[in-house]
Amino acid sequence: MADQDQLKALRLRIDSLDEKLLELISERARCAQDVARVKTQTLGEGEAPVFYRPEREAWVLKHIMQLNKGPLDNEEVARLFREIMSSCLALEQPLKVAYLGPEGTFTQAAALKHFGNAVISTPMAAIDEVFREVAAGAVNFGVVPVENSTEGAVNHTLDSFLEHDMVICGEVELRIHHHLLVGETTKTDNITRIYSHAQSLAQCRKWLDSHYPSVERVAVSSNADAAKRVKSEWNSAAIAGDMAASLYDLSKLHEKIEDRPDNSTRFLIIGNQEVPPTGDDKTSIIVSMRNKPGALHELLVPFHNNGIDLTRIETRPSRSGKWTYVFFIDFVGHHKEPLIKDVLEKIGQEAVALKVLGSYPKAVL
C-alpha cells in the first residue's frame, strides 16, 4: 500500500511538472512570434526577413548542453530542444527543405535531425535537383550527403558544387545502421535477391559474404526504393535503416549488419545565406591548381605555416581543362577571421581559381 501511495505522489508531481513545462514551452513559442514581428517591422525596403539563423541555433544547443546536469545525456537534451526550436520556428516561418529522396532515406533522417520535424521536407530524385531547388528559391535549404566514413566522398555532391553557386550553411553527422528488412509475405528461408543502394551494399559487403554469399545483390537508386520493392516480392530482402523500416512497415530480419560499427555519413546544409562566425566553425573551399609537381604542397603550406587544421581534402578532375585539378578542402575556422583571410589570400595568389563554399558551425548533434 505504501508503494502505491508513493507512486501516486510521484505521478502527481510529474503531472504538475508537465503542466509547468507546457506553460514554459507556450511562452517560448509566443516569444518566437514576437521575434518574427520585430524582424518584419525593422526591415528596410526590399529586404526579406531571415528567420532561421544557423549560428543562433548552434549557440543555443551548445549552451543547453553546457547547462545540462543529467540524468539525460547531452545529445538527448539537445534533441529535445531541437524539436522545441523547430516547432517555434514554424510559427515564425515554416522552413522548406529539399533532400535526396525518396522518403525513408538517410538524407531525410539527416534533414530531420538538423531542422527538427516541424519543417516541410521535399524529396528530390537526384542530388543535382536539390541544388536546383535551392538556387531557384523553391525551398529555403537543401540537404545532401558529402562523405561516408567507409566509402569516402560522394562525387555527385562535389560535382554539383562545381556547377552551382551555393552556400554551405551547416553540417550534419549521422551514424548509419543498416538492417536486413523483409515484408510480411517474405519467405525468409528462401531469399534469392537483396536490394539496396550501391554504397550500402558496399558497407555491408563482408556481412553479406558471410551470411548470404550466393544471393543476388541488386543496386537501386536508394535504400528507400529497395524497401518499397520488398513489399511486393516474397523472395527478396532490402538493406535500409530504421526510417525506411517504419515507413514501409517492414520487419528487421537482422539488425546492424554494417561491416564497421563506426559507419557514419556527413551531410551538408546548402542555402543562399552566409552564416556569421560562432567561434567554433568550419570552412569549405574549392581550389583549382595546375597539374604540376608540387602543386598540392604549395596549396597546403599556408595552412601548415598558420597552424590551421585541415579536416578533409578531396581531389576531382576539373571540367574546364585536362591539365587542371580541383581540390575540395574543409578546415577549422571562419573565412571572416583575419588569420583565415590572410591564408585564403596567399592560396588565391597561387591558384588558378579559389571559391569559398561557405563557413558554418561545426555539427552539434
From Swiss-Prot:
Alphabetized SUPFAM superfamilies for the sequence: ACT-like, Chorismate mutase II, Periplasmic binding protein-like II
Site (Essential for prephenate dehydratase activity): 265
GO molecular function terms listed in the Swiss-Prot or TrEMBL record: chorismate mutase activity; prephenate dehydratase activity
Swiss-Prot/TrEMBL catalytic activity: chorismate = prephenate; prephenate + H(+) = 3-phenylpyruvate + CO2 + H2O
Domain Prephenate dehydratase: 97-272
Coiled coil: none
Domain ACT: 284-361
UniProt binding sites for substrate: 11, 28, 39, 57
GO cellular component term of the entry, any: cytoplasm
Keywords: Amino-acid biosynthesis, Aromatic amino acid biosynthesis, Cytoplasm, Isomerase, Lyase, Multifunctional enzyme, Phenylalanine biosynthesis
Start and end residues of each Chorismate mutase domain: 1-96
Top-level taxon of origin: Bacteria
Intracellular or extracellular location(s): Cytoplasm
GO biological process: chorismate metabolic process; L-phenylalanine biosynthetic process
Pathway membership, UniProt: Amino-acid biosynthesis; L-phenylalanine biosynthesis; phenylpyruvate from prephenate: step 1/1; Metabolic intermediate biosynthesis; prephenate biosynthesis; prephenate from chorismate: step 1/1
The EC number(s) this enzyme carries: 5.4.99.5, 4.2.1.51
Chain's role: Catalyzes the Claisen rearrangement of chorismate to prephenate and the decarboxylation/dehydration of prephenate to phenylpyruvate.
Protein name: Bifunctional chorismate mutase/prephenate dehydratase
Organism: Pseudomonas aeruginosa (strain ATCC 15692 / DSM 22644 / CIP 104116 / JCM 14847 / LMG 12228 / 1C / PRS 101 / PAO1)
Classification of source organism: Bacteria, Pseudomonadati, Pseudomonadota, Gammaproteobacteria, Pseudomonadales
